[in-house]
């Protein structure tokens, strides 16, 4: 293992100050809230469409909550590694949501959401059922996620840089 890798591993285990942890936790919870609102909108869509969301889709959707849960655990323990999890959460969640909803999902595991929002707006036949309708609320609750997740990612990167610089100025290894 190179010295730079050892230094980075040591840095990632460094304890955060209360203020930095609070800022990151706020952003992490904002991303989590946006994801929850988006999922609630899917329930609203399913009700509108009279569509029964399959159980496997409920289980798959839990994957969205892995990064914010890990980040929350790291933040509660004030670990510098939370910088990476909050930043990754912002990038991964935004990219995944936009890919699935604006383009085509990579896999056909998404039930009625195997179609992008543009096709769903026009209407599609899915498993013998005609599904149509994407309204402004659907769009807002899709686009609000990257609107908060990208600034969260940028804040995590900025705070990491500041935190590391403060360690260097204090004479500690970063």
Predicted feature residues:
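C-terminal TM-helix exit segments that contain a strictly Trp-centered aromatic cap at the helix terminus
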Residues: 34-42, 91-114
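Interfacial segments of alpha-helical transmembrane regions
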Residues: 17-29, 79-93
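Cytosolic juxtamembrane helix at the C-terminal end of the final transmembrane segment
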Residues: 150-171
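Cytosolic juxtamembrane helix and N-cap/initiation of the first transmembrane helix
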Residues: 2-31, 161
């Amino acid at each position: 293992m190179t010295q730079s890798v050892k230094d980075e591993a040591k840095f990632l285990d460094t304890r955060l100050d209360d203020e930095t942890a609070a800022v990151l936790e706020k952003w992490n919870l904002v991303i989590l809230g946006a994801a929850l609102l988006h999922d609630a909108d899917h329930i609203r869509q399913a009700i509108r469409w009279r569509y029964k969301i399959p159980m496997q889709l409920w289980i798959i959707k839990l994957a969205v909550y892995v990064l914010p849960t890990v980040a929350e655990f790291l933040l509660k323990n004030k670990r510098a590694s939370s910088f990476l999890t909050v930043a990754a959460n912002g990038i991964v969640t935004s990219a995944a949501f936009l890919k699935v909803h604006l383009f085509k999902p990579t896999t056909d595991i998404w039930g009625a959401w195997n179609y992008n929002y543009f096709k769903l707006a026009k209407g599609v036949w899915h498993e013998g059922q005609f599904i149509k309708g994407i309204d402004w609320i659907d769009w807002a609750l899709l686009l609000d996620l990257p609107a908060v997740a990208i600034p969260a990612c940028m804040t995590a990167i900025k705070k990491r840089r500041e935190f590391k610089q403060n360690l260097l100025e204090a004479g500690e290894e970063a």
